[in-house]
Amino acid sequence: DLHSFPTRRSSDLHSLSATSGVSPGHLCRAKFIVLGLIVALVTMMQSALLVGFAKLIGVTSPFPASHWIGYTASIMVINLAVLAFQILLSVMVENQIVALGVGIVGIFLALFGVILPRFLMHLTPWGYYALAAPADYVGVDLVYYNLPYLSIAGLAVVGGSLFMLVTTRFNTREA
């Protein structure tokens, strides 16, 4: 039934786990690894394409390579944290419209996070997109910001630890 597509999953994690012989937590981690590789690759390609586009249109200002690499790495960590969160949410909530809705709210948090107080940006993975802004204009001058490497590292450690903890607990749940 086409109308029920977004609200029901076609396969329950525990049913899939039971038929495949792989634990639910391992399935989540495998999904993260496969999708994470794609997300990481696309993030690097996007970064390279932006640099190439700047050269193509004739941007002549000096290229801040180390700053750009740091920014790309930061965005990759944030993208992977969002991916991990969305994978867990999709598994834990039966109605997939909830996961979709949370993702849409996250997009708005990412877009408008710059107007939030800094501490609020740290409360969701999407808030980190605003924290990782590499530069902005002050008047007519382009000003580069110091990237929040410590905050991004914290997101990686806390997000990764929570993902491992939750997926490990999936293995102890009854089917």
Where are these regions (language model features)?
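Short, small-residue-biased leader/transition segments that mark boundaries at the very start
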Residues: 2-10
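Membrane-interfacial segments
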Residues: 9, 13, 49, 53-61, ...
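Tryptophan-centric aromatic hotspots in well-structured domains and transmembrane helices
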Residues: 12-14, 88, 126-128
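Short helix-to-coil transition segments within interhelical loops
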Residues: 16-24
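Terminal transmembrane helical anchor/hairpin motif
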Residues: 100, 105-175
